[in-house]
């Protein structure tokens, strides 16, 4: 029998406190998603069909993290999800949605409803700005067959030229009491749009994770051989692709990674793996970040069904040992129950954590609401569950094309307590990590990694760590028993 190592998970270890002059409120949580993309908080929402679509992704990016839109949908639908995130706000919208004057108000309503916007510039066939259609123009219109050109606010409009700063734009909009400022070139061709909503959001969400154009960052999951999907997502403006598999150390994954890096300019996160060798091979093939975790998720049964995996603390430690030599970030995916688990993962050298169950219960997640015994819940399922596999994730478990009755699941379907908004959950997780860094005397995540020392604890130590000898009469927002 070949026993390679003693393997530990989050509940097996604790960090030892250190002398500290660092206050939790003063620490920096800035980190990296990939070698080229930063994060303002080290949190990623999982690419699961009950966790991340555009609403979760928008919420995560506004808070400084990022969401990974799942792939259990056709290419066009996934592209639309990415577009909704990229269009949700922007410093300057460089490719604004527009409409032609001969279109109907019904057409305009489809556009505004689909992209959740309150108005749209109107252009002619040459792209020249000729008006703008806003809520004010259509508020009392009941005949949706009317032409946009008959209802819109016509030129002259208050406009600005390419290169205007957001501060200058804000002053101009305030002066003229307008909510939308079209950006035009010297020939009056529409080149961009600035909205007062985006300026307000910049103030409301100062830590938002944005790209070079002021748009929220977002990632998307793809499967083996899905180069067409990857290309369409990159065209839509996705910031990073997640090449997602239950077994990231496979020939097909390595081949797909090499093909993507050869043909597209985009950062690729690859996983899932748990060994040094796998990490080395993925980095050699071009991975911009490595995702770690086989079987730690609450809804994953891989370790039981297949007898394969590794406890998450040891898995992170293995992969970080190799990835750190190449300055490649490691993402700890799965097994996070408490904010203390996040702190442990970061102290082990992970650059960020990917979260599923804790976000599945939020308002923004795509799971279904349900009431059970008088309490609110939301549905949550593993991507290896029968339901998820029949919707498109079977390739993640190397069962693509298998009839539904022949699938061998590696996950279950269940429910999790409703936990309010994404911002409420992230607030508690961030607060816990800040507290941990204060105990460790770490001003930033790098110092946490450099400073942290661990002790292995017994089952009695774990029991002592949890609430004991008392009945909880009022639940805490960050402790689930």
Curated annotation (Swiss-Prot):
CDD domains: CBS_pair_IMPDH, IMPDH. Its cofactor is K(+). One of its GO terms (biological process) is GTP biosynthetic process. The active site is at 300 (thioimidate intermediate), 396 (proton acceptor). It is an enzyme of class 1 (oxidoreductase). Mycophenolic acid (MPA) is a non-competitive inhibitor that prevents formation of the closed enzyme conformation by binding to the same site as the amobile flap. In contrast, mizoribine monophosphate (MZP) is a competitive inhibitor that induces the closed conformation. MPA is a potent inhibitor of mammalian IMPDHs but a poor inhibitor of the bacterial enzymes. MZP is a more potent inhibitor of bacterial IMPDH. The keyword rRNA-binding does not apply. IMP binds at residues 298, 333-335, 356-357, 380-384, 410. NAD(+) binds at residues 244, 293-295. One of its GO terms (molecular function) is nucleotide binding. K(+) binds at residues 295, 297, 300, 464-466. Residues 92-148, 152-209 form the CBS domain. It comes from the Bacteria. Belongs to the IMPDH/GMPR family. Homotetramer. This is Inosine-5'-monophosphate dehydrogenase. It comes from Helicobacter pylori (strain J99 / ATCC 700824). The gene is guaB.
